[in-house]
């Protein structure tokens, strides 16, 4: 009996050992083998493009800045761009570093508008101006200055395709063979913001004398100007007429501003054109603009044919007539025309026709307007009754011996007050006049002025309109 119990116990133990051994073998089969794993379980490799140097925000991706490497596909961020052809020529939307992969969100087809082609900031993001936030159109994304090529067509296309946008022109020379035109339609107008050294120049092939470099509001003519949103501007830049072109015409309607620009070598600097004989048309604010004309007998600095314009802080030289007004109710402040004795303007008969302010309007307003060396400072047509406050006429040279401060074609019906005229040389043969009139009997007044009545000629009529003695 005992032998049977022992035999049964042994059999049970042997069965248990066999079962446990099979379980261990099964577990070992499910474990990774230990030791060298080469050639077993390798991950998929891919070729990917990445940066090999740090680059700035807004930089262009070029062949020299990238490299291709092989990496484990599983290690790449989702959406990583693999092919180098998909990144070349793109622009970065953020600063990137060597070894960094390209994601679609980090690239754009066009350069951000507040940086140049080197990734340098054009205007600092200081809360005042930010080209990117403003949505300006960066012109040099579409054309290049300084190439010697005509960019007229390219600029015109850009204007036509970007209504109600502001176009930014960086520094450089933009050669034009014909005028650039903009629309007067409020739905199509554009504004221009120019770097101070963005230089527009008439080419040698410019054929039509006195056509302007820019015609603002020249197409889609309209009489709409009351809308508060109907305003467009031109700011900055240099406009060079090459002694054959005008600089800027303003046409159509609307409220327009021209600021911080330099104009040179032009037949006419700025011409504001009327739509009708009553002077209706655009209303323009010109502020801090310098003009140097072509120095020819047909040269003008500014011509205002419309009403209600404002000219402020301007210096104008090398024109036979600096400013001509046929419109009325214009306000002129702190303007300084200067006559330059250079051929053909240095001819005595030509000089006698020179005028700083030529006024054919019914009434215009002058404040702190002064001129040097023109034969006539202010000329008024027959029906003009303008007002001059704190104005100044000065002659530093006795050349050609004709010095008239104010000349009226007809009667004098204006107001001159707190103004002065001075001959800064001692030539006794010079004919000087404070006021000349074509007809007596006007109702104008001269109040609190500075000039020497002993220096004026017998033709001077100022004594008939003085309400107090001049100071000298």
Enumerate the language-model features and the residues they cover.
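Right-handed parallel beta-helix/beta-solenoid
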Residues: 118-154, 472
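Right-handed parallel beta-helix
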Residues: 156-160, 221-229, 239-252, 268
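Extracellular/surface-exposed low-complexity segments
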Residues: 121, 449-472
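Mature, extracytoplasmic segments of signal peptide-bearing proteins
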Residues: 2-15, 22-119
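Extracellular beta-strand-rich, repetitive "passenger/adhesive" scaffolds
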Residues: 147, 164-173, 193-199, 225-227, ...
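Short glycine/acidic-rich loop motifs that flank beta-strands on beta-rich extracellular proteins
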Residues: 178-179, 201-211, 242-248, 266-273, ...
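Surface-exposed loop/turn motifs in large extracellular/passenger domains
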Residues: 184-193, 213-236, 250-260, 274-289, ...
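N-terminal extracellular ligand-recognition/capping segment immediately after the signal peptide
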Residues: 156, 160, 164-210, 239
